[in-house]
Amino acid sequence: MKTKLNIYNMQLLLFVFLVWDPARLVLANIQEDEAKNNITIFTRILDRLLDGYDNRLRPGLGDSITEVFTNIYVTSFGPVSDTDMEYTIDVFFRQKWKDERLKFKGPMNILRLNNLMASKIWTPDTFFHNGKKSVAHNMTMPNKLLRIQDDGTLLYTMRLTVQAECPMHLEDFPMDAHSCPLKFGSYAYTTSEVTYIWTYNASDSVQVAPDGSRLNQYDLLGQSIGKETIKSSTGEYTVMTAHFHLKRKIGYFVIQTYLPCIMTVILSQVSFWLNRESVPARTVFGVTTVLTMTTLSISARNSLPKVAYATAMDWFIAVCYAFVFSALIEFATVNYFTKRGWAWDGKSVVNDKKKEKASVMIQNNAYAVAVANYAPNLSKDPVLSTISKSATTPEPNKKPENKPAEAKKTFNSVSKIDRMSRIVFPVLFGTFNLVYWATYLNREPVLGVSP
């Protein structure tokens, strides 16, 4: 029984092998022939499309305006240079238009081609108005894509890296916001020949990759699109504009500038708590803090272009500098009045000593005169002489010595100016910080859209 079953299985396998394998070979040959036929068909289609095609002439020449639909996909945005007022952007730049001369009929609705075909047909002469430098990537092959639909609609995509100008208004720096434009349009064709249209709405015509931001000092808030017409001596041209809205991050500047300035001002106010006779210590505090503020103000300006107006950081540094310099002037004032106090104390002590010596001399002179006048009478009378000899010589009444006031009490006393400064300076500086930060941090970012 088992032997019969094995024989049956072997016969079945043999039958499948003899029948299926030739069928598979025939099917493979048919598919290969179809592929060869498709290649032949598409080659003929391309040859027919290019036969008599003049890529020097735009589509619809003399009949209609060529409409070019555009959209942008941003793969990388940044960095942004404040000193040069420019930014770098890496994009897939897509353009779509219709060319009736490229209609075809075939087994496929879309022909997917590379850059070689793009050089043989008419393409828009798009350029970037505010671009300083533009690079078309060519590694390992030119990064270009061309698709032709059977109705003559073409999609032309290329990868570009553009360095574009970004006008900045730095009055609110570093709490500022900017709108960096990307402007492009036709170089040779006026609005009566070629016009540009955004393919989708504002959010879809310009898209940024989720991980496309390359910004360390900015947040990319979003983007907007627009369209305008400019006039020149050669005619009117369509200009497409995409604005990228940026808000600066303040964290770096808080650590680099604001905190050092605040700590320097606080350090300058420590001198109010030192004795006013500590001239070297208070001088070191004043001079060191002034020099520190000067260094901070210079370093803060190095990361900015040389603008003719003051920024928000400049105002903060200027006020901090004024507080530090005022602390030094306060010490000079206290020291000046301290020296005058020494002179007054010295004069009072000297005058008291002179008056004391003069009173003693007057008393001694009076006593000497009295003795000289009455001495002869006492010598003639023996009784009086005896009494005078036995009597003790009267001494002038001595007044208690007036000890001069110790100068140390006047010199070591705390100055009224220091007492006032300990309260006034911190209160004023705290009020300034409260007003400054409340004003700038609560202000809505003003995105200036440049024309």
From Swiss-Prot:
Domain of life: Eukaryota
Any one Gene Ontology cellular component term annotated for this protein: chloride channel complex
Bilayer disposition of the protein: Multi-pass membrane protein
Keywords: Cell membrane, Cell projection, Chloride, Chloride channel, Cytoplasmic vesicle, Disulfide bond, Glycoprotein, Ion channel, Ion transport, Ligand-gated ion channel, Membrane, Postsynaptic cell membrane, Receptor, Signal, Synapse, Transmembrane, Transmembrane helix, Transport
Positions of 4-aminobutanoate binding: R94, T157
Catalytic activity: chloride(in) = chloride(out)
Cysteines paired by S-S bonds: C166-C180
SUPFAM superfamilies: Neurotransmitter-gated ion-channel transmembrane pore (SSF90112), Nicotinic receptor ligand binding domain-like (SSF63712)
Topology Extracellular: residue spans: 29-249, 301-311, 442-451
Positions in the Cytoplasmic compartment: 271-280, 333-420
MF terms in GO: chloride channel activity; extracellular ligand-gated monoatomic ion channel activity; GABA-A receptor activity
Modifications the protein undergoes after translation, according to the UniProt entry: Glycosylated.
Glycan attachment residues as annotated in the record: N38, N138
Cell membrane among keywords: yes
Means of activity regulation: Activated by pentobarbital. Inhibited by the antagonist bicuculline.
Signal peptide: 1-28
GO biological process: gamma-aminobutyric acid signaling pathway; inhibitory synapse assembly
Transmembrane segments: 250-270, 281-300, 312-332, 421-441
Subcellular location(s) per record: Postsynaptic cell membrane; Cell membrane; Cytoplasmic vesicle membrane; Cell projection, Dendrite
PROSITE patterns, sorted: NEUROTR_ION_CHANNEL
Quaternary structure and partners: Heteropentamer, formed by a combination of alpha (GABRA1-6), beta (GABRB1-3), gamma (GABRG1-3), delta (GABRD), epsilon (GABRE), rho (GABRR1-3), pi (GABRP) and theta (GABRQ) subunits, each subunit exhibiting distinct physiological and pharmacological properties. Interacts with UBQLN1. Interacts with KIF21B. Interacts with LHFPL4. Interacts with SHISA7; interaction leads to the regulation of GABA(A) receptor trafficking, channel deactivation kinetics and pharmacology.
Sequence similarity: Belongs to the ligand-gated ion channel (TC 1.A.9) family. Gamma-aminobutyric acid receptor (TC 1.A.9.5) subfamily. GABRA2 sub-subfamily.
Function: Alpha subunit of the heteropentameric ligand-gated chloride channel gated by gamma-aminobutyric acid (GABA), a major inhibitory neurotransmitter in the brain. GABA-gated chloride channels, also named GABA(A) receptors (GABAAR), consist of five subunits arranged around a central pore and contain GABA active binding site(s) located at the alpha and beta subunit interface(s). When activated by GABA, GABAARs selectively allow the flow of chloride anions across the cell membrane down their electrochemical gradient.
Comment text on domains: The extracellular domain contributes to synaptic contact formation.
Protein name in UniProt: Gamma-aminobutyric acid receptor subunit alpha-2
